Amino acid sequence: MSDKARTLQGKVISNKMDKSITVAIERQVKHPIYGKYIKRTTKIHAHDETNQCNEGDFVAISQCRPLSKTKSWTLAEVVTKA
């Protein structure tokens, strides 16, 4: 694995799982015909070892090896608390 892991920032939308969070990543995509920028959201499951995140927190997550069927990201830092 490279020493520069891919990182993303997003908002925690669920922390109901043990040691896991769901993060919503927003991006803007240009419409192919009309050219207007549209918001698109991706939901990613991430590993939160200490259960420190709450819903509404803005967090940074980094890519890691697969931890389960749906988790291959881990919490890097909490940017802002809700």
Swiss-Prot record:
- InterPro entries membership: NA-bd_OB-fold, Ribosomal_uS17, Ribosomal_uS17_bact/chlr, Ribosomal_uS17_CS
Alphabetized, the UniProt keywords read: Ribonucleoprotein, Ribosomal protein, RNA-binding, rRNA-binding
Coiled-coil residues are none
GO BP term, pick one: translation
Q: Gene Ontology terms, cellular component aspect?
A: cytosolic small ribosomal subunit
Q: Does the keyword Cytoplasm apply?
A: no
Q: Name one Pfam family in it.
A: Ribosomal_S17
Molecular function GO labels: rRNA binding; structural constituent of ribosome
The record's listing under SUPFAM superfamilies reads:
Nucleic acid-binding proteins
Keyword Ribonucleoprotein found: yes
Q: Which family does it belong to?
A: Belongs to the universal ribosomal protein uS17 family.
The subunit structure is:
Part of the 30S ribosomal subunit.
Its job: One of the primary rRNA binding proteins, it binds specifically to the 5'-end of 16S ribosomal RNA.
**Protein name (Swiss-Prot/TrEMBL):** Small ribosomal subunit protein uS17
